[in-house]
Amino acid sequence: MPPKGHKKTADGDFRPVNSAGNTIQAKQKYSIDDLLYPKSTIKNLAKETLPDDAIISKDALTAIQRAATLFVSYMASHGNASAEAGGRKKITPQDVFVALKDVDLAQFVPSVTQSVNEFEQEVAQRKKDKVVRAQDDQDHISSSESETEATEEEGNKRIRTDE
């Protein structure tokens, strides 16, 4: 029995169908347009590196967007090859450094290493701040509870008057 949402075609294969009952053709290849990074992100990154009075044309932004997507995919491919050579499935910063050296971009390794170290320090600081906030919240909650208990005890006391 075919899976739900599939329809038998004339050649005997089962293919998924859309809500209208038409078979959905599987996409064989992806183009770069399917993988592009958001233009807003690319534009913000480009503006950070350019002078304040610089203007980026629409065509230039598209070229930067496509180049960034291709470069990251290329580096990820080389990093993945390095990880697989090391018997791992996950790409580490060291794999990226090896990939940079493999594609003759070794001059960028020191600056990328510095950026990775800064990022790791930021992450560690955020974790510390989160722990401190959680402890402060816990202290605040426990002090609020003790104040509430004290108020309730005072409210339960009855004043005795000798008449």
From Swiss-Prot:
Subcellular location: Nucleus
SUPFAM superfamilies (alphabetical): Histone-fold
Keywords: DNA replication, Nucleus
An example Gene Ontology biological process: heterochromatin formation
Region of interest: Disordered: 1-22, 126-163
Pfam families documented for this protein: CBFD_NFYB_HMF (PF00808)
GO molecular function terms noted in the UniProt entry: chromatin DNA binding; protein heterodimerization activity
GO cellular component entries: CHRAC; epsilon DNA polymerase complex
InterPro entries for the chain: CBFA_NFYB_domain (IPR003958), DNA_Pol-Epsilon_Subunit (IPR051377), Histone-fold (IPR009072)
Entry function: As accessory component of the DNA polymerase epsilon (DNA polymerase II) participates in chromosomal DNA replication.
Complex formation: Heterotetramer. Consists of four subunits: POL2, DPB2, DPB3 and DPB4.
Miscellaneous comment as given in the Swiss-Prot or TrEMBL entry: In eukaryotes there are five DNA polymerases: alpha, beta, gamma, delta, and epsilon which are responsible for different reactions of DNA synthesis.
UniProt protein name: DNA polymerase epsilon subunit D
Native organism taxonomy: Eukaryota, Fungi, Dikarya, Ascomycota, Saccharomycotina
